[in-house]
Regions:
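Alpha-to-beta junction loops
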Residues: 12-23, 41, 105-112
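Short secondary-structure boundary segments
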Residues: 25-26, 47, 72, 115-118, ...
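Flexible hinge/capping segments at coil-to-helix
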Residues: 31-41, 45-67, 150-153
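Short beta-strand->loop
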Residues: 32-42, 112-116, 124-138
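Secondary-structure junction motif
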Residues: 65-86, 149-154
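A late-sequence structural motif
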Residues: 126-164
Length: 164
């Protein structure tokens, strides 16, 4: 088992270092990809923040505040979302670690965009709201287009049965 960011995992699959990997669909275009679940993206800010009174948050509203993001390559879905928005955020900090990002947000040093699955581990001291319009990442199991091990196929079947 290897732990890496999306770009590292993708490269490991392509170069045959691993049979398969968990990826977001956004980085799996040259791989065989089996979607497993959709994970909503949310705006995240400290408790007591002015945006906490809203039911949902637009990117332009969020970008009025200093933004803390994951280092490019760690979360390509959010990077892709940022490139689609006509309003450019003021990125104050960029980190590889979710714990560090949430700590900075919790301490009022900025706001961030995160995935609902990640937020389950960091609920204390932060508030999240859905983005408007809604956005999500599609997570799944990716394989090389040329590799197809029995172990990988067994794992895929197990995940499909367990998650769905």
């Amino acid at each position: 088992i290897f732990d890496g960011n999306y770009d590292e995992i993708r490269d490991w699959i392509i170069h045959g270092q691993v049979d398969c990997g968990f990826l977001s669909s956004i980085v799996a275009d040259d791989l065989t990809f089996y979607p497993l679940l959709n994970d909503p993206l949310c705006a995240v800010f400290p408790e007591g923040h002015p945006l906490a009174a809203k039911n949902s948050v637009t990117l332009p509203e969020l970008f009025e505040y200093p933004l803390i993001i994951e280092t490019p390559g760690c979360d390509n879905d959010i990077q892709h979302l940022l490139t689609k928005c006509p309003v450019r955020p003021k990125i104050s900090y960029s980190f590889r670690d979710d714990t560090l990002i949430m700590s900075f947000v919790r301490n009022g040093l900025g706001v961030t965009i995160s995935q609902e699955l990640v937020l389950k581990a960091f609920a204390r001291g932060v508030v999240s709201r859905p983005l408007s319009p809604s956005c999500h990442r599609t997570l799944g199991l990716a394989f090389s287009k040329t590799a197809n091990s029995v172990v990988s196929q067994t794992m895929l079947r197990y995940l499909q049965e367990t998650i769905h």
